[in-house]
């Protein structure tokens, strides 16, 4: 596999088009790298001598030291000239954030860049992108001001996006949702480095446990499918594909120069490559959040335990709509629970502990379900507004979770008052969702990937691959 480490963890970076003009692209890139990147940083600007208290050079060729990676942020007509200079300098990788290429019909400009890339062996991300944010190495070429977006905590989810704006949005949104991110890559027109190259690289990245894709169109379909099929056996891959409609496909073409194609073809390609398709970005990260925990079921049977009967019924509906089945509880499990529970408790699946359930009742029910052979994972519904549940109940659930090798998903619906309860569950390593539909999406992602891994031996049904809710 091609080495792309110089993009994610370079020893030195040159910013061509660096600036100290507040609000400019070159300013924001320099500001972010100055604050985050621990390596050597070299501003390149033909007019300015000092930028961010660093000596600025008129050309990358004037820099006395070796440069591993460069970011180009200048007008499109001049990009090929500075790329040539990068080649002469021995730069390994270049991120071209500049727009003005095939997305506006200027394909000849891209052809020239590719010619230079092949001549010197330079790898290119872009053009028409915002580049890389790596939460571990400090690489941050995102030219969005930290005054306007928040950055997420460290996590194990990698996000690859053709759209730069969407990549920036994801950084801000995942921060708000308390979802940890490893890295975000915006690759734009992908004249060189594409989705397949990035999948191959991230497959061996210790900080990537889930890969999320935002795709507008794929050019080298067979190469992409081969990489995805290989990588998905090790790391779950989730994809959000836009351009489903004629209007969307037309918009994608003018946005990143993508050839969208019939959506049904992408649907089939994703299924063959074991990629889990999402319908929207909320769904994308709902599934990623569960998969990041790296605990996968050994059975496709799902158990529901609840103190709110209606939510249990809705969750059962949502699971079936996703092609999942409710676990068949064993006779021993049912007998044991009936002996310990009051008569009003419904001992079946869903298991309705009824509205006066306390932490002891949840503990008995959860332990029994975890011991049942047909139960692969459990959706724990907690109506935390009832007086019988408190923060102690959360501690009980977390204690049981730590002693089990079966995944547990939390459904906790409500408003601000229960937020501390849900936050504590998340901090304890559980994926938490506010509705039956979103909890079901997480369950289906876990079962889907367990089938791909070979942990569950069953055929992948047509509706195991695309969420139907």
Predicted regions and their residues:
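Catalytic-core regions of core metabolic enzymes
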Residues: 1-469
């Amino acid at each position: 596999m091609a080495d792309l480490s110089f993009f994610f963890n370079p020893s030195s970076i040159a910013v061509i088009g660096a600036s100290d003009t507040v609000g400019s692209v070159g300013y924001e890139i320099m500001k972010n790298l100055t604050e985050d990147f621990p390596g050597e940083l070299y501003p390149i600007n033909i007019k300015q001598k000092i930028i961010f208290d660093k000596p600025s050079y008129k050309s990358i060729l004037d820099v006395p030291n070796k440069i591993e990676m460069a970011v180009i942020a200048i007008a499109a007509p001049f990009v090929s000239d500075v790329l040539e200079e990068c080649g002469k300098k021995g730069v390994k990788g270049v991120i071209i954030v500049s727009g003005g290429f095939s997305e506006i019909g200027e394909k000849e400009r891209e052809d020239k860049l590719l010619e230079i890339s092949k001549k010197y062996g330079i790898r290119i991300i872009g053009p028409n992108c915002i580049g890389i944010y790596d939460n571990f190495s400090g690489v941050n070429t995102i030219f969005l001001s930290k005054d306007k977006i928040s950055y997420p905590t460290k996590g194990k989810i990698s996000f690859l996006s053709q759209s730069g704006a969407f990549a920036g949005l994801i950084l801000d949104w995942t921060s708000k949702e308390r979802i940890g991110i490893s890295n975000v890559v915006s690759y734009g027109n992908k004249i060189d480095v594409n989705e397949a190259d990035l999948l191959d690289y991230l497959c061996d990245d210790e900080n990537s446990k889930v890969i999320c894709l935002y795709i507008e169109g794929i050019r080298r379909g067979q190469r992409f499918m081969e990489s995805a099929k290989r990588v998905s056996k090790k790391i779950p891959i989730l994809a959000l594909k836009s351009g489903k409609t004629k209007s969307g496909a037309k918009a994608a073409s003018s946005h990143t120069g993508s050839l969208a194609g019939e959506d049904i073809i992408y649907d089939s390609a994703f299924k063959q490559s074991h990629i889990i398709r999402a319908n929207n970005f909320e769904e994308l990260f709902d599934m990623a959040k569960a998969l990041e925990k790296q605990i996968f079921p050994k059975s496709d049977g799902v158990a529901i335990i609840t103190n709110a009967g209606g939510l249990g019924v809705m969750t059962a509906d949502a699971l079936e709509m996703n092609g999942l089945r409710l676990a068949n509880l064993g006779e021993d499990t049912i007998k044991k629970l009936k002996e310990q529970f009051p008569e009003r408790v419904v001992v079946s699946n869903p298991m309705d502990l009824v509205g006066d359930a306390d932490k002891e009742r949840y503990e008995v029910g959860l332990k029994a379900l975890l011991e049942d052979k047909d139960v692969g994972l459990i959706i724990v519904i907690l109506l935390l507004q009832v007086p019988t549940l408190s923060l102690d109940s959360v501690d009980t659930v977390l204690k049981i979770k730590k002693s089990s090798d079966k995944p547990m998903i939390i459904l906790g619906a409500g408003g601000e008052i229960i937020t501390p309860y849900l936050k504590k569950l998340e901090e304890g390593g559980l994926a938490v969702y506010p509705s039956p539909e979103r909890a079901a999406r997480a369950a289906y992602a876990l079962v889907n990937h367990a089938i791909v891994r070979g942990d569950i031996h069953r055929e992948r049904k047509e509706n195991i691959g695309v969420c139907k809710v």
